[in-house]
C-alpha cells in the first residue's frame, strides 16, 4: 500500500467515516490531500482497513490452546464452513431477490443450494440469542442469554462490592472503553461489567455469561482454525465459556459508522477481512495462518436501511424503498466478491457456505408502524407496588419485565390487561404460559417474570426516534429469516418444512466430520440436523487443488 495514502488517513481520521461528514476547512484540506495522493475507492478502503487493523490486532491476538496441535484436515470431508449473517433480511427478501434479479450473487448461489423457505430464528429475536442459536445449537433456555441487555438475579452491579444481588446486565457498545472509537477504545472496560459474587466479585465478561460451548470451541479443540467478525467488542461471547474459542476475532465497533453509507463501508471493512482469511491470512492480511475451518461475519447495511426513516419497505409485500434496495445490492455485491475469491483460490469444492440472519425487522408493512409509549408499562407496574419493577427491557418489538417480588406476578399481569389496548399489547406471557416456552423464572435467575409481545407493527424506541422498524419479538417479520446452504455439488432444492437456526450448529459439525453431540446445547435439547443435506456427498467432496 502507498505510504502517502496510509499516512494521510492515519494522521487525519480518528474513525474511518466517509470524508463527506467532515466539515469546514478540514474537509477541504482532506479533499486536497486525497487529490494529491490520487485516492481511488479501493485505495481508501485499503487505507481504512490498514488503520483499523493496526488498532485492533493487538487486542485480538490469541495464544494457541495449551498442548493443542494443528493436524492436517481430513481429506474426505468439507474442509471449511463460511457462515454469513445478513442481519435484518427476511426469507421473503431472498425469495423476491432470486425472482427479480436472476443474475444476483444470491440467485446464482440458490441454483446449487438447499434453501429453507420456512426458517425461524430464536425468540426473543435479538442479535445475541439469534447468533448464539447458530453457533451453539441451543435456545435461550440453555445458552442463558435472553437478550443483549437483560437482568440477572444472581449477579451484582458493575463497580459494586457485591453486597447487593440482582442487576441489569448490559452487553452492548456501552461496555466499550470508548464506544465511539472503531476499536472500542481498546476493547471491553471491565469496570462496566456486572460482577459475580460467587466468584470473588470478579467481572463477568460476555464469554463468561454463556452457559454452553460453541462450534468455535469444538472446532478449535479438534485442531481447526476459527475466525469471526461482528459489530461490537461484546461479541467476545462467541469465544464460549472457555474464552478461547476464536483464533481470530475481529469486532470493529459499528457505532463509529453512523448512517447507511458509512454502514456499507463498515461491512466492506469486514468483507476485506474475510477476503484476507480466504487468502490464508489473518483478518489483518499480515500473517500466514491458513484458511479457517470455520469463519464468517455479519452484514449490517440491510438492517440499518430497514430501520432508517426514508428507507424500509414500500408495502406489505416486501417491495423495497430505494435505499433498502441499494443496501441489498451492496450486500449482494459483497457476496459476489467473497465467492469470486473462493473460486480464485480453488476453495469452492472444499467450502460449505451458509447464508442466514440473526433476525428480521418489523414491520414490513409501513402502515402498521406505531411507536409505543415507553412510560405506560413502568407506570402500570408501579401502580401495583412502588419499586416492584427490578428490571425492564423495552427494546425493539418486545418488552421483558423482572419483578423484585415474583409472588406479585399475577397482580402485575392483571394491571397490564387493563391497559392492554392502550399499550398495544398483543400477548402477555407469564406463569404457565411463559414456562411453556422458557425456564421457570423462580429457578433461572435470568428469565423474565413477564414477556410482552406488542401488536404487529408496534416498536419500543426512544422518544423522538425516527426508527421505522426494529426486532426482538415473536412476530413473523422478526423471526422469518433466510437460510441457504450452498455447495457446488448441490442442485437447487427448496424445503418448506419448518426449521430453526439452532439446527445450523450441529449441521456445521456434521459437515466437517465432527460429532454434533460435542455441543452442550445439542445434547441438552436434542437439536436435530437440518433436513435435506446429503452429508455423505459432502464428505466425499475432494478439495480442489490449489493453495490453502
Name every feature range the model reports, one short phrase each.
Residues 191-194, 208-213, 387-514:
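Active-site neighborhoods of enzymes that stabilize oxyanions during catalysis
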Residues 46-57:
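Bacterial N-terminal signal peptides
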Residues 94-149, 225-227:
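Short, structured active-site-proximal loop/turn typified by the sulfatase FGly-forming signature C/S-X-P-X-R
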Residues 140-148, 243-281, 317-332, 373-393:
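Acidic, His- and aromatic-enriched active-site or binding-groove loops in soluble protein domains
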Residues 232-255, 281-330, 337, 367-370:
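Active-site His/acidic residue clusters
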